[in-house]
């Protein structure tokens, strides 16, 4: 006997044709909260990420990447290019509250699972579409990746040292932020559908989600008309000051700090800098020291 799932999303069924990380994590999170998630995979190997990451086992190797991003999800193989495969998909959609995919816009329509098609089958359906660059515009049909999202949003520049090329981080911040925003959008749309009987389409993108992570930096840039990286930096390095940083001291001991306005004044007082900073109009915690000339002006 199969045990009934529990959790706040118990009783919700989601069907997804999503792959990779940004496309699958929202539904993994739904499964964690009790939803039944059915993942549609292609014939001849299924989701390509089944062969990504570290593989354990011999004949039936298990992928660390796939397991990380598809935990608790059921899987079925369908050929959605065939009439029979699409007919089975449509029957599943009739029984589901949520459908998700991360295909390019034209591919979803070409394969018969775009929003306009599926909402005719179930008007209350909550439909999520994850893309690289959004549904409209010149890049809409281009494939997107986490690295591209980090680069176009400015995150890759923020990771780099001054004068060095852009550098993407080890953590898939564009993929994961997109997944979390998609998850939040799905929950909001589910509440709306429960209250009104009308479904909604949730659209997210890798670049748009990564730009959200740069929000405070970009807002401060507009207000101060400064470089978005050095002018509004939260996390500091030895070369680029910030209000938070992680270093190793001369003995290798990790040093971590983050300042708020009160601690900033106390620290500058203790170092004997506060009066000098006030005289030069540079006592604002958010001020970034952008050049040697600026440093000399304030601290010289």
Per-region residue spans from a language model:
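N-terminal helix-loop segment corresponding to the beta1-alpha1 unit
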Residues: 1-198, 222, 229-230, 285
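Glycine-rich beta-alpha junction loops
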Residues: 44, 132-134, 206-211, 251-253, ...
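A structural signal for well-ordered alpha-helical scaffolds and beta->alpha junctions
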Residues: 62, 141, 179, 183, ...
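Short Gly/Pro-enriched turn/cap motifs at secondary-structure boundaries
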Residues: 66, 229-239, 245-246
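Beta-strand segments within the central parallel beta-sheet cores of soluble alpha/beta enzyme folds
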Residues: 199-207
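Active-site-adjacent elements of ketosynthase-type condensing enzymes
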Residues: 213-235
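Aromatic-enriched alpha-helical interface/lid elements that frame and gate functional surfaces
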Residues: 243-300
């Amino acid at each position: 006997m199969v045990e009934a799932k529990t959790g706040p999303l118990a009783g919700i069924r989601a069907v997804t044709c999503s792959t990779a990380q940004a496309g699958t994590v929202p539904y993994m999170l739904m499964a964690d909260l009790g939803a039944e998630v059915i993942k549609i995979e292609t014939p001849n190997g299924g989701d390509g990420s089944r062969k990504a990451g570290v593989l354990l086992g011999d004949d039936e190797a298990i992928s660390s990447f796939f397991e990380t991003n598809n935990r608790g999800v059921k899987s079925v193989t369908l050929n959605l290019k065939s009439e029979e495969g699409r007919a089975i998909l449509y029957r599943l959609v009739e029984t589901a509250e949520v459908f998700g995919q991360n295909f390019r816009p034209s591919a979803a329509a070409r394969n018969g699972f775009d929003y306009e098609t599926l909402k005719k089958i179930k008007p209350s359906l909550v439909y999520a579409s994850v893309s690289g660059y959004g549904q409209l515009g010149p890049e809409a049909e281009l494939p997107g990746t986490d690295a591209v999202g980090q680069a176009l949003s400015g995150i890759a520049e923020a990771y780099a040292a001054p004068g060095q090329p852009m550098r993407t981080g080890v953590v898939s911040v564009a993929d994961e932020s997109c997944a979390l925003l998609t998850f939040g959008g799905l929950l909001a749309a589910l509440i709306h559908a429960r209250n009104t009987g009308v479904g909604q389409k949730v659209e997210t993108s890798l670049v748009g989600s990564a730009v959200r992570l740069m929000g405070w930096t970009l807002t401060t840039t507009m207000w101060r008309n400064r470089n978005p990286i050095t002018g509004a930096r939260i996390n500091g390095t030895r070369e680029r000051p910030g209000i938070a940083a992680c270093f190793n001291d001369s003995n290798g001991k990790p040093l971590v700090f983050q300042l708020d306005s009160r601690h900033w004044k106390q620290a500058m007082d203790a170092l004997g800098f506060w009066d000098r900073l006030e005289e030069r109009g540079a006592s604002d915690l958010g001020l970034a020291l952008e050049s040697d000339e600026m440093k000399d002006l304030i601290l010289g």
